[in-house]
């Protein structure tokens, strides 16, 4: 890894009226992203012509990085998560109204509603082949769906032979490894669980956190899992062996984790900053903070992270409704 690489603020995306909860970027690097928010909507952003302005005045506000051209509405409560299909045609959202929705991005319309959770949906994911959908909720269950909106399996509650989580399931992800089809989940019961996708049976229970788990992320090759939450530590797990590899101390509550698609970096959104770890040295190579400092009562912090597919751009959603866009040096950035 080039030791000199760093991230600089390239601009902002403004359009949400409440906290940004999730950001999804297409895997083919198309110039758009989709974000979800507590304003009960999703926004589709055009980033075809991002600002390349470099500020000469460090006090100047960062430039607008793109424009929202479609607002997706229909959920009756906070939209907590959003992901994209691999072809970039559809967005999938989960909401505190207890439903998932599949959206046709060409029309902005809901094409499918997924009804079955009895409490707030906190996390959603698409399988690599887009044929399966997984969701996690405050009803302590994980549900596996087909794209027709039919629930094929429920883990937890009265289902799953007592293997399910005993607290809110805050985050769920598919492993991208086709040789080991698995689902990884994190919960407020302080555990991370790995499930066999073929039969929805528990494969491994990963324990080590001292507080609730907010976020899990799986590395691009499917070999590693990172988890984080209330205790302010990120645990790195070997998914094949089912064992903890090491800890990284973030020092504050972790709300989101994501691996860089093409560098050995792990990013954590905490209540203090966005931390970028170099996993080779296991050191924080950068601490990203917003260009404005909020009053303590406002608690301005990052809630959600997503990398562009080419690894050049980090999108970070904040409690103030703004998405801040950070560029890896060499890809053009905005000096602050």
UniProtKB/Swiss-Prot annotation:
GO terms for molecular function: protein kinase C binding; ribosome binding; translation regulator activity. SUPFAM superfamilies: WD40 repeat-like. One of its GO terms (biological process) is negative regulation of translational frameshifting. It holds the Pfam family WD40. Gene3D superfamilies: YVTN repeat-like/Quinoprotein amine dehydrogenase. WD repeats lie at residues 15-55, 74-113, 116-155, 164-205, 208-247, 249-287, 297-336. GO terms for cellular component: cytosol; nucleus; ribonucleoprotein complex; ribosome. InterPro entries: G-protein_beta_WD-40_rep, RACK1-like, WD40/YVTN_repeat-like_dom_sf, WD40_repeat_CS, WD40_repeat_dom_sf, WD40_rpt. Keywords: Repeat, Ribonucleoprotein, Ribosomal protein, Transducer, WD repeat. It comes from the Eukaryota. Belongs to the WD repeat G protein beta family. Ribosomal protein RACK1 subfamily. Homodimer and heterodimer with RACK1A. Component of the RACK1 regulatory proteins that play a role in multiple signal transduction pathways. This is Small ribosomal subunit protein RACK1y.
